[in-house]
Amino acid sequence: MLLIDIASTSLNVGGTSSRLAKVERIAELLRAAAPDPELVAIVVAWLSGELRQRQIGVGWAALRSLPAAAGSPALTVTGTDAAFSEIGAVSGKGSAARRRELITRLFAAATETEQAFLVRLLSGELRQGALAGIMVDAVARAAEVPATAVQRAAMLGGDLPTVAAACLAAGSSGAAGALDSFTLRVGRPIGPMLAQSAGSITVALERHGGATIFEAKLDGARVQIHRTGDEVTVYTRSLDDVTARLPEVVQATLALPVSDLVADGEAIALQPDGRPHRFQVTASRFGRSVNVAAAQAKQPLSVFFFDILHRDGRDLLDAPTTDRLAALDAVVPARHRVDRLTTADAAAATDFLRATLAAGHEGVMAKSPTAPYLAGRRGAGWLKVKPVHTLDLVVLAVEWGSGRRRGKLSNIHLGARDAATGEFVMLGKTFKGMTDAMLDWQTARFTELAVGGTDGYVVALRPEQVVEVAFDGVQASSRYPGGLALRFARVVRYRDDKGPADADTIDTVRALY
């Protein structure tokens, strides 16, 4: 298969608003790739906006000056993927020049259509929230299996390209069996369960229809922990392996009386009095260039387990919350568990929320006692209750500031994700809540994300940066395309641990109106 086949499909898919048309066009390409599992995996990864290599050290700056395009298509898909691997493997002295040389060679062999696709793929412009859902549907269509089966296999396998390759290689008669082979496996990360928002304790109790399990919601970093014997691996919310950076989590896990374990938890930096540090202190321990020993000595992390998905040969994904917590409590000491209260009484739950907030945490999680663990899905079984409304939105553009903020990229344009189209719907602007340090940081960050330069008053951005925004409410507005705007929006923090696919949807905003 040639690169032009994928580039043309991407162009075609981007040019139609019909979800069904997008799905069918991608499914058609997948059927053509089906005889070769590796080819299928590449197609799925690229059209989902991802590289199989994850990161290859090529940023927007490296793509600004490109050679003339080739006259006719000759690049193969597998050859291009191999070129990505070669670029990503470059390191050491002279690596920047060598990487530029390889990029130039690749782009010189690409046609204009292929170059445009490669730029979007390498710069992250293909990453949109709806792509994952469209790709799941396309794989299901091509393999003639239910989309729900593909989604579950991908969540348990942790990797849609791998699932798609196995499913399509098995043919229509064996696809269902291939999907069934993807089960929870210790050592292979799965998509984490996500929570919906609830406006109050009362709402959470009503939605769960009675007694609810309330847990302290810590403002740390989500971790998924796997243990097999004496080997422990730790993954982030985005399924990156951070084992080497979190020795405290490894040590705490090895101290548990288990042989095999998959657990969900939170790593957090605490002050001497037990109150949490601001999130950025915790996040600093996750950097790739961190000196782990020095960072651990300066600011150790604590780990708190709040769910268990597998223990010593028993899968617990489909077990109700009460059973999973009983299995957790049997092996995890209280000092490593989040505070918890089970009640149907709103007053008692409100007191628990107040105590949690007084301890410096951000709110509570309300969990249905009967809910299974929905890997990779946002369900009503988990509800987050915070004292103020917050949303995770994407920064679409930014304006140059004036007065104290002159010379800084300041007023940010906020967008919610449209799950149906993968586009973002603007909800307003804000510069409230920004410190001087934040203004300095975002000026540098948004210069990197700028599309078409930074000379204009309004600087358009690639929709990649997620920001947590607090607000007082949602109001009707004819000014914005979604008909809604946020009241008194202010920046809480930038969420580098989340991507645009994790941003809240416009449907979530509508539900708050």
Swiss-Prot record:
Known HAMAP family for this protein? DNA_ligase
Query: Which of UniProt's keywords are assigned here?
Result: ATP-binding, Cell cycle, Cell division, DNA damage, DNA recombination, DNA repair, DNA replication, Ligase, Magnesium, Metal-binding, Nucleotide-binding
Q: What is its EC number?
A: 6.5.1.1
Provide the cofactor list for this protein: Mg(2+)
Q: Which gene encodes it?
A: lig
What reaction gets catalysed by this protein? ATP + (deoxyribonucleotide)n-3'-hydroxyl + 5'-phospho-(deoxyribonucleotide)m = (deoxyribonucleotide)n+m + AMP + diphosphate
Q: Which residues bind ATP?
A: 215, 222, 237, 266, 306, 378, 384
A Gene Ontology biological process in which this protein takes part is: cell division
Q: What is this protein called?
A: Probable DNA ligase
**What is one Pfam family matched by this protein?**
DNA_ligase_A_C
Top-level taxonomic group: Bacteria
Family, per the entry?
A: Belongs to the ATP-dependent DNA ligase family.
Q: Which GO MF term does the entry hold, naming one? A: DNA binding
Catalytic residues as annotated in Swiss-Prot or TrEMBL: 217 (n6-amp-lysine intermediate)
Role, per record: DNA ligase that seals nicks in double-stranded DNA during DNA replication, DNA recombination and DNA repair.
